[in-house]
Amino acid sequence: MSNEMKIRFWGVRGSYPTPGAGTVKYGGNTPSVEVQAGNRTIILDAGTGIIPLGRELARTKRAGELLLLFSHLHHDHTQGFPFFVPAYMPNAKLHIYGPDGTHESLKNVLEHNQSSETFPISLRDMSSSKEIQAVRESQVIVWDEAGVRVAESAVGLSDEAVVIRIHKSYAHPGGVFVYRITWHGQSIVYATDTEGYVGTDKRLVKFAKDADVLIHDSQYLDEHYWGQLEGFPATQGYGHSTVTMACEVAASSLAGQLVLFHHDPAYTDNMLAGMERTAKSLFADSVAAHEGLEITLSPRFDYANAPLSAKEREVQYAQNG
């Protein structure tokens, strides 16, 4: 089994899908990101990007066991799930975790999205095995030799465990989960649908400290956010960040790489290319996410050859992961 962790972006657009000539380079599908940790597949959100991802998982016979994490339950992060091919495969096992909604449980929201009034096939009629569970900020999600489960701490886990920590951000209407995925010393932070604060979001900076890759909401150009871009109303308070806000978090948290994410649906490829240039001037290792973008991370530590006890490795992992 490879010790590399791979990220692939299948949907990078916010709010609603935007097909067309103006979005060919970066793509128009709404959020969905695949993380491959060895032979384990973790999916972040189920916007329309999960539709081509599902077809690829089925084609490559990688749909046996999957972990799907919802950041929150707004439509652009759930709308692709009814069309997710592995959910219809009897031999597929889906672990679906995320926050409860403001007024409904996670499971009820997913069921409502596929009620008879809105979709011809119910959640129950999808043939896969599904474990649907709401999680809390204080918990961790673990995927190790024993399988996928929710735990109260990450103490005592093996080196092979994928550990996913949760940070709840209140900088988006209804709140949103930010996830930190760690495996073999490599860390990815997924911070979509969050809005920056004056002086940066210090809680998020602490949570994202030393992440190898920070995927951060950057829906707006600064002039759009402040109502200074012709044809675009001000968006302060909408729960999304500017390029500058994303770069401030990346710099303050000492992230290795910043990936701009959740692009505004009205932005053309040319606008996003300009946004990427702006980001690079503020945080050099920045890239604007596009469909098909792949990032590969190599293990930060060689546990097999390290002259440390299991307890010492656990401490080192906690300090550096």
Residue ranges and their predicted role:
Residues 184-187, 195-291:
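Cap/insert and terminal regions of metallo-dependent hydrolase folds
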Residues 1-189, 195, 199, 269-320:
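Binuclear metal-dependent hydrolase catalytic cores
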